[in-house]
Amino acid sequence: MRVEYSKDLIRKGISTISQLKKAKIRVEKDDKKISYKDAKPGKIDVNEFKKAIYLLIEADDFLYKKAPKHELNEEEAKEFCKLIIKCQEHLNKILANFGFEFEEKEIDEGALYIVSNKKLFKKLKNKNPNLKVVCTEGMLDIEDMRAIGVPEKALEGLKKKVEIARKNVERFIEKYKPEKIFVVVEDDKDELLYLRAKNLYNAEKLDADEILD
C-alpha cells in the first residue's frame, strides 16, 4: 500500500514538473514577443535611425557582390551578421523611446581590458568608469614593433618602453586577479597586441565596436 502511495506521489511530481516546464517555456516565448500595438508616445532618435540605415546600406552590398546565390563563406558571414546585429542594436535604442524594453549587454567589470592607445582607454572609461583598463601605448614585444614597420635603429630605444608596458599589464593582473583578460581590438596593430597577449596571458579578443556601441 505504502509502495503504491509512493509511486503515485512520484507520478504526480513528474506531472507537475512537466507542467511547470511547459508553462516556463510559454512565458519565456511570450516575453520575447513585441507588438507595434504596445508602442507608447515618444520621440524618434534621428541619430540612431541614421546609424541603422547606414549599416543596412553597407549590408546591402552583399546582395550585389554575392548574387545570384547569396552564399557567404565564414569571414563574409561574420561581417554580414556583424552589420545586421549592430543595426538591430540601433533599432532597439529607437524602440526604447517608445516604451519597449530590451535586455542590454552587460560589460564585465570583473575582467581586465588591455588597449593599445590612450584614445581607446578614454572611450572605455567614459563608457564605464569602473572598468579595469590598462593602456600599453604600443606592443608587448619588440618583435611586434618590428612587424609593424618600426625602423631597426629605433627598436633599441623602444625596448625599455615595451618592457615597462609588459610589467604594467602584469602589475594589473597581480593586483586585480581578473576573471578574464580582453584585448580591445580596433585595427591590425591591435590584432598583433592581442596575439601576443593571448600567448602571454591567455587573453581573449574583443572588437572595439562590440563594447563601445
Curated annotation (Swiss-Prot):
Lineage: Archaea, Methanobacteriati, Methanobacteriota, Methanomada group, Methanococci
Protein name: Uncharacterized protein MJ1481
Annotated transmembrane regions: none
InterPro entries reported in the protein's UniProt record: MJ1481_archaea
Highest taxon in the source lineage: Archaea
One Pfam family linked to the record: DUF2100
